[in-house]
């Protein structure tokens, strides 16, 4: 159930922000000192004074919600529906009655605050890649129009506006990671698999040639299926989990038409967060979403 009371009361929204922001204790955002005292209020937010640097701040200072004339409850509704319901920014513009540019800037600021995925692999691990068409949307037209003829053969790259996105499915922990790259190369694959708990990590892949060097590396035990030969499952060897997760990622990107390749990473981090809160009740999901960005 959606946490409706938080979305209609500015006081409740402010209290929730303070609860999450200072969950490890109040400190000064400027000098990080903990010697602070209450110092009046600013609108519905508690104000503080730092005894070390003599600066004042409030519950919003230093967060993605600071310096905004829009009510905090509206921003809570925006980030909640954006993550939980995959609502487009154009639709949020209508729902919270705030201009498109204002919503876009604030949502982008929220997305940039999300942590990058750091896979710590236990294994066995499935790894696969899919490709996302992402161009130069949002940039000034400083170059001639590109040809719209038939695409060239081969795998996509950042330069060709078709970015590879790797999906890692750790069967040991059940975690899924979606990580974009500029190219699907051996070096990038090794970097993704570098943080592992075992000396020899079991890796399941398809027949893509970039994975072939793993066969000669003692740090990996690679097993694979060749889709081109009609082979998709061979006992425990398959990448079906990755392909299923990739289809969910494509569906996530669908309402956000024409994502720029320079901004694809934050959108995929939002997708990762959505998978974390998917089964949580409304209030708990909102807390998790805010904790991730604060």
From Swiss-Prot:
Keyword ATP-binding: no
SMART domains, A to Z: DDE_Tnp_IS1595
One matching Pfam family: Zn_ribbon_IS1595
Keyword terms, alphabetized: Plasmid, Transposable element
An annotated GO BP: DNA transposition
Signal sequence range: none
Tagged with keyword Ribonucleoprotein: no
InterPro entries: Tnp_ISXO2-like, Transposase_27_IS1, Transposase_Zn_ribbon
Disulfide bonds: none
Protein name per the record: Uncharacterized protein in transposable element ISH50
């Amino acid at each position: 159930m959606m946490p409706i009371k938080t979305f209609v009361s500015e006081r409740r929204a402010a209290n929730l922000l303070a609860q999450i922001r200072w969950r490890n204790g109040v400190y000064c955002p400027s000098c990080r000192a903990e010697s602070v005292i209450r110092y009046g209020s600013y609108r519905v937010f508690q104000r503080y004074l730092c005894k070390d640097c003599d600066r004042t701040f409030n519950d919003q200072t230093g967060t993605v919600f600071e310096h905004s004339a829009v009510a905090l409850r509206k921003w809570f509704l925006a980030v909640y529906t954006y993550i939980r319901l995959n609502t487009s920014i154009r639709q949020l513009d209508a729902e919270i009655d705030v201009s498109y540019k204002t919503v876009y800037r604030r949502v982008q600021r929220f997305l940039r605050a999300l942590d990058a995925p750091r896979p710590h692999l236990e294994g066995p691990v499935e790894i696969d890649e899919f490709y996302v068409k992402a161009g130069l949307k949002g940039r000034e037209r400083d170059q001639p129009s590109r040809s719209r003829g038939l695409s060239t053969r081969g795998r996509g790259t950042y330069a060709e506006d078709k970015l590879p996105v790797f999906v890692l499915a750790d069967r040991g922990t059940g975690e899924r990671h979606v990580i974009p790259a500029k190219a699907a190369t051996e070096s990038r694959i090794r970097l993704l698999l570098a943080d592992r708990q075992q000396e020899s990590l079991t890796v399941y892949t398809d027949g893509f040639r970039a994975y072939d060097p793993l066969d000669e590396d003692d740090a990996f035990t690679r097993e694979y299926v060749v889709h081109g030969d009609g082979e998709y499952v061979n006992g425990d060897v398959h990448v079906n989990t990755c392909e299923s997760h990739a289809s969910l990622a494509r569906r996530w990107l669908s309402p956000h038409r024409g994502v720029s390749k320079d901004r694809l990473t934050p959108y995929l981090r939002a997708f990762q967060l959505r998978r974390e809160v998917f089964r949580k009740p409304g209030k708990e999901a909102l807390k998790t979403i805010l904790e991730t960005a604060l």
